[in-house]
UniProtKB/Swiss-Prot annotation:
This is Malonyl-[acyl-carrier protein] O-methyltransferase. SUPFAM superfamilies: S-adenosyl-L-methionine-dependent methyltransferases. Pathway: Cofactor biosynthesis; biotin biosynthesis. Gene3D superfamilies: Vaccinia Virus protein VP39. Converts the free carboxyl group of a malonyl-thioester to its methyl ester by transfer of a methyl group from S-adenosyl-L-methionine (SAM). It allows to synthesize pimeloyl-ACP via the fatty acid synthetic pathway. It comes from Herminiimonas arsenicoxydans. GO terms for biological process: biotin biosynthetic process; methylation. It catalyses: malonyl-[ACP] + S-adenosyl-L-methionine = malonyl-[ACP] methyl ester + S-adenosyl-L-homocysteine. Disulfide bonds: none annotated. Transmembrane segments: none annotated. Belongs to the methyltransferase superfamily. HAMAP family: BioC.
């Protein structure tokens, strides 16, 4: 995973915070799918890591109504949106969490860890979990956004999509961080869009434009933009829509019950 500029990432998501809920239908569907995998285990303290505006936190509260729910996000504006939902939320990076050791029974994170360095984030998540605690998250893996990568890559040769980890790399990194009983469920989701501009807005509009894939047309030149539109038109599906593929991975892992 490349070294992502977290300051730029935070600013990008902060700019998108006010409109995020209106655009992030895909992200909300992924969170709902992850919620279907929540374990029937007791929990007194739960963390929503990378909470965004806090919409996913309601899923956790519904599952563990008596638990203390804390949330964190890299973006100050996202945290403010979460506060408006009466959530206890703080600014925090999953690679350097502002919480003490072994304080959560469950850590949840939906579509956030693809932005993180696994060798930093996974040990941090393991650190803040209690022994026997559970980590549940969704992330993107290799093959995601391949239509964008091929379309734009053949035009200007610039990488416009993150080099997402493979499922095996995710599993290996979790075990290397000290997790046990790692279970994964891979799913391929395809979103449909009327045109390329709308497709890119589904990414850029939620702040996820640090991949480079959602750069504005004017930044790449009119001729290149028109060439990209022509190339992507060849991908229209049977419904007459432009597809965008997400290789999703839903993961559950456990921190060892043995004391350090």
């Amino acid at each position: 995973m490349p070294d992502i500029d977290k300051h730029k990432l935070s600013l990008s998501f902060s700019r998108a915070a006010a409109q995020y809920d209106a655009i992030a239908g895909f992200q909300q569907q992924v969170a709902a799918r992850l919620a279907q995998l929540l374990p029937a285990i007791p929990a007194t303290c739960v963390l929503d890591g990378g909470c965004g505006t806090g919409t996913s936190s309601a899923l956790l509260t519904r599952h563990w109504p008596d638990a203390l729910l804390l949330a964190c996000d890299l973006s100050p504006e996202m945290v403010r949106q979460a506060h408006a939902r009466q959530l206890t939320a703080v600014c925090g990076d999953l690679e350097q969490l502002p919480f003490s050791k072994a304080c959560f029974d469950v850590v949840w994170s939906s579509l956030v860890l693809q932005w993180c360095q696994p060798q930093l984030a996974y040990p941090e998540l393991q650190r803040v979990l209690k022994h026997g605690g559970r980590l549940l998250f969704s992330t993107l893996t290799s093959g995601s956004l391949h239509e964008l990568e091929s379309t734009f890559g053949e035009i200007d040769r610039h990488r416009r999509v993150l080099p997402f980890a493979s499922e095996q790399q995710v599993v290996d990194a979790l075990y290397a961080a000290g997790f046990e009983h790692v279970q994964c469920q891979a799913e391929r989701w395809v979103t449909q869009h009327a045109d390329l501009k709308t497709l890119l807005t589904s990414i850029r509009g939620i702040g996820a434009n640090q991949t480079g894939a959602a750069r504005r047309p004017g930044m790449m030149g009119k001729t290149q933009w028109q060439a990209a539109q022509v190339r992507y038109e060849n991908l229209r599906d049977a419904d007459g829509m432009l597809p965008l593929t997400y290789s999703l991975l839903f993961v559950s892992a456990e921190k060892s019950r043995a004391q350090d």
